[in-house]
């Protein structure tokens, strides 16, 4: 199994168990589905069951959302277009520092930066219609997943989550 992790935070963003594609060697796109599923009982540390009220059976709730967001425990955040542009400046610099730290050559760093710039140019015009997600750690310095709803053949919309390829580390499990 392949695991795609945020290079900067180590957060797990997605695995190859989902249907994904690489667009123009710069953006991973994952088609998601809305799901509703049961949530198991949560035991609180330090709770004394004998002191609690006796329950008849187990209460199970449900959670709804996008399968990828729920499975990877992504955390929704918000950006204005200006805030997102400012984030991109900081993020690009942090990525370049990380690439150099990891021993990438100047040519490899320039190629990765070029691909990242290409990816940004593709998504920036549509940024006002997108939702944003951080990894499980909610670290604002890491990669931000972009969610966009696209028209599909049946007349509805398909949720598509996008990640910049060069902000992810591909790890074999």
Curated annotation (Swiss-Prot):
Organism in which the protein naturally occurs: Ixodes scapularis
Family: Belongs to the TCTP family.
Name of the protein: Translationally-controlled tumor protein homolog
Protein task: Involved in calcium binding and microtubule stabilization.
Coiled coil, from the record: none
Alphabetically ordered keywords of this record: Calcium, Cytoplasm
Disulfide bonds: none
Transmembrane segments: none
Subcellular location: Cytoplasm
A GO term for molecular function: calcium ion binding
Organism domain of life: Eukaryota
Domain spans labelled TCTP: 1-173
One GO cellular component, as annotated: cytoplasm
The keyword Cell wall biogenesis/degradation appears for this protein: no
Keyword Calcium: yes
């Amino acid at each position: 199994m392949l695991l795609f992790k945020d290079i900067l935070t180590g957060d797990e963003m997605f695995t190859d168990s989902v249907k994904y594609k690489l667009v123009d060697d710069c953006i991973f796109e994952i088609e998601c589905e809305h799901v509703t599923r049961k949530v198991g009982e949560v035991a609180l540390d330090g709770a004394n069951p004998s002191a609690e009220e006796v329950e008849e059976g187990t209460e199970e709730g449900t959670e709804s959302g996008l399968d990828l967001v729920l499975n990877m425990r992504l955390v929704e955040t918000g950006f204005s277009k200006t805030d997102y542009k400012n984030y991109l400046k900081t993020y690009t610099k942090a990525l370049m520092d990380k690439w150099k730290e990891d021993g990438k050559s100047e040519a490899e760093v320039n190629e990765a930066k070029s691909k990242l710039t290409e990816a940004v140019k593709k998504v920036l015009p549509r940024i006002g219609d997108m939702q944003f997600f951080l990894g499980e750690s909610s670290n604002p310095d890491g990669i931000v997943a972009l969610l966009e709803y696209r028209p599909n053949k049946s007349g509805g919309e398909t949720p598509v989550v996008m990640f910049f390829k060069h902000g992810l580390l591909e790890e074999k499990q």
